[in-house]
UniProtKB/Swiss-Prot annotation, chains A, B, C:
GO terms for molecular function: DNA binding; DNA polymerase processivity factor activity. NCBIfam families: pcna (TIGR00590), PRK01115.1-2 (NF002219), PRK01115.1-5 (NF002222). Belongs to the PCNA family. CDD domains: PCNA (cd00577). PROSITE patterns: PCNA_1. It comes from the Archaea. Keywords: DNA replication, DNA-binding. This is DNA polymerase sliding clamp. HAMAP family: DNApol_clamp_arch. Sliding clamp subunit that acts as a moving platform for DNA processing. Responsible for tethering the catalytic subunit of DNA polymerase and other proteins to DNA during high-speed replication. GO terms for biological process: leading strand elongation; regulation of DNA replication. It comes from Methanococcus maripaludis (strain C6 / ATCC BAA-1332).
Amino acid sequence: MFRATCNTRDFKKVINATSNLVDEICFEVDENGIKASAMDPSHVALVSMEMPKEVFEEYEGDIHDIGIDLEALKKIIARGKGDEKLILDLDVEKNKLNVTFKSNVTRKFSIALYDVSSSNLKVPDIEYPNNVSIKAGAFVEALKDAELVNDHITLKVDEDKFIIYSKGDLNQSETVFDNGIEDDDATLAEFNMGEASRSTFNLAYLKDLTKSTAAEDLLKIYLGSDMPVKIEYEVSGSKLVFLLAPRIES
Amino acid sequence: MFRATCNTRDFKKVINATSNLVDEICFEVDENGIKASAMDPSHVALVSMEMPKEVFEEYEGDIHDIGIDLEALKKIIARGKGDEKLILDLDVEKNKLNVTFKSNVTRKFSIALYDVSSSNLKVPDIEYPNNVSIKAGAFVEALKDAELVNDHITLKVDEDKFIIYSKGDLNQSETVFDNGIEDDDATLAEFNMGEASRSTFNLAYLKDLTKSTAAEDLLKIYLGSDMPVKIEYEVSGSKLVFLLAPRIES
Amino acid sequence: MFRATCNTRDFKKVINATSNLVDEICFEVDENGIKASAMDPSHVALVSMEMPKEVFEEYEGDIHDIGIDLEALKKIIARGKGDEKLILDLDVEKNKLNVTFKSNVTRKFSIALYDVSSSNLKVPDIEYPNNVSIKAGAFVEALKDAELVNDHITLKVDEDKFIIYSKGDLNQSETVFDNGIEDDDATLAEFNMGEASRSTFNLAYLKDLTKSTAAEDLLKIYLGSDMPVKIEYEVSGSKLVFLLAPRIES
């Protein structure tokens, strides 16, 4: 059996973040919680999410692989109000996942399961020379700035600065987070630099994988030269990790 | 002659509710107020509205049939601000209806009359086994839930419950209003059940005829098995009635 | 050299107002401030803006002609937040204008200069029989009313009234600002009439040139019979002037 209860707001955040990059996923359920990971269709980005049983109000789970059409689940979850109680409940016999929203009215959706087998994908254990922690709002704004001039951007760590840089045929854009400057907002919350490095990424992917963040969420960004960027953040106890391959400049 | 004054907000609501289903209508005006009824172009739904003279600040009306392009009237009415005074005034000679908004500025529209003759349609006097009163907001949300899985829905009354149900090829949706459960919000304000019954309707029509309701409006819904559904509500003293034919399942 | 600092909000307003009608412009910079004027591509409207050095927090300017793609500049300026500090700074060597937004983060754009030579256009010195001052919000609403019935409108001054009038095949619209009526809001702030007159204009242009006004901005409108209309307004010390040729009715 599998049955879990939580608040709608948190589950919505986790599902939205995951579904921006992948279309279907296999929830690997067991007594400890829900895990899932998947690559985007073009195998450039990897998404991994972990919802330990502690984030649920009630949780009971045997071992199950629950294959889900994320697009359909996202639309259903979007129908829930933030303060409604959300109940997930596997109907093994009918091969369906029931999603129930409970307030003074009971609204129940049944969603057919997909034949998605568990991927056993793991986020590779890479050693990164640099990492920074940054508020998601400021990072997303820098991506929007870069979007005005080109469709790829360069993330640089150099001389006490984290720089988001983009250059088009005519114009260019640059956002500088300077670790040496007093920053009351703690926009750049952490800055750990091993060696100067830079990598270039597809902007659309970076936008997709940060689309569901809230402005105050802290993103932990791991960076090296011509290495995949790793971006981690937490949503009320659930953990999201994204890995994006660099664009190798010819 | 015909000349009537009211506040823009209320008239806007009545016109919007009516114009969601029909394109043209004949306002039957007399000393008691304005009445109109029309069928939608495919003859599946009937709309009827009644604005008694008491809802107007000033009202003077001889007997007139005023044929109106509802789409044009709706756009004009949309230009009025809620707290402006609205004056309707028939220019028999020029065959136009003048619509004037008055605040510190005077804005006057003249709209050409259509050759729509009075339909003398009446809402048929059907005996219904069941009726419920429900807040429009909750009903509209249930329609949106249903929309995720199919384009028609089933309204059921059974065992102290009013159920809105939809089933697609893969997924299904169900909203249950349970008369037996304490409901502080009075979402289900009344529940009068004669016999268990169910009918299926085109979802797009139900959405159209509830599109202009406010969340707190009370809809009175009359329901039987394979019978048209009748939905009534009031807007500041004006009465709106909708009748929608059931979808006969093959 | 040219370097100027101001708040983002004001500069955004001036650039938006200018860029609604023209695509490129030459900023004529000198020690007194920035001036620019341009005609729209179809030579029906003339736009002129003046930002004296007093509107800037800091200002230093030698004589320069700075040709700008207004569409690109508008998009960049749109990325600034209202309360950020904006720094304009000419890089003569690289032939670029740098636009920097400064808050706790520094965001810098470089925009390539265009080869737009100074136009030396002047707003012609026409004597107008009438002028009115009117709140932009009320004027824009009247344009929207007119838009429902036709794509051109007539501005009339007659008998203590300023009238915005439009007539379509079926319907018509008329907004009357009556100088004789007490108007607590001072919507019609001034009314100076020399002789009754009327001119007809393309509605889309009038909408474009008032698109960036705020509801409370005072527009000074100069009007005669079959003459261009001149519309002036101020944005925090900067001056905007628009001239629009009349539509000669055949």
